[in-house]
A protein has these predicted regions:
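Active-site-adjacent loop and "lid" segments of alpha/beta metabolic enzymes
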Residues: 1-76, 90-175
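Conserved H-loop
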Residues: 79
């Protein structure tokens, strides 16, 4: 991550390991012994925007983890923290949809939420087909995410995502 920021011009760290490339994401919160994961120290030092993804399979576990991890990041000087519920990571199909259904509860943490649902297996496994046939499901879930407070969408199909944003903005009377 350091090399990407300092030498290759990256502007943001998108961490799919929940703070630790050494597997901390798979260790239950109560069993984690490292006070501050190395990645968190790096983010605090470099002062770059940071996407913190969760692999927790329940919203309660995710909220608990995010609360602890956000505090650790802030203790180290991190400012621009973005939360990613990590759809498709560490969760089965039912768990993904249970978290999606209650995703607005993440807004209590007062940080932007990123949703990367585009073409995910949770769509095409439910509907049948594959990633190439999941555009309608992606658009539906993008729209729901926006209505539940997501501020950032990670997408493959930009035109369709922009249309979803415009429709939700019109519904919510945003200019």
């Amino acid at each position: 991550a350091r090399k990407c920021i300092e030498e290759w011009g990256a502007d943001i760290i998108n961490d799919v390991s929940e703070g630790g490339i050494t597997g901390i994401a798979n260790v239950p919160l109560e069993q984690r012994h490292e006070e501050y994961p190395e990645m968190f120290r790096l983010v605090g030092e470099l002062k770059v925007p940071y996407i913190l993804m969760s692999v927790q399979p329940t919203l309660a576990g995710m909220m608990k983890g995010f609360a602890k991890e956000v505090q650790q990041l802030r203790d180290l000087g991190a400012k621009d923290i973005i939360l990613d519920p990590g759809f498709g990571f560490g969760k089965n199909l039912i768990q993904n949809y249970q978290i999606y259904n209650e995703m607005e509860k993440l807004n209590v943490l007062e940080l932007p939420v990123l949703v990367g649902i585009s073409r995910k297996s949770m769509i095409y496994k439910l509907l049948g087909g594959d990633a190439t046939t999941s555009l309608n499901g992606t658009s539906v879930l993008d729209t729901i995410a926006l209505m539940k407070g997501a501020k950032i969408l990670r997408v493959h199909d930009v035109k369709e995502a922009v249309e979803a944003v415009r429709i939700v903005d019109a519904m919510m009377d945003k200019d």
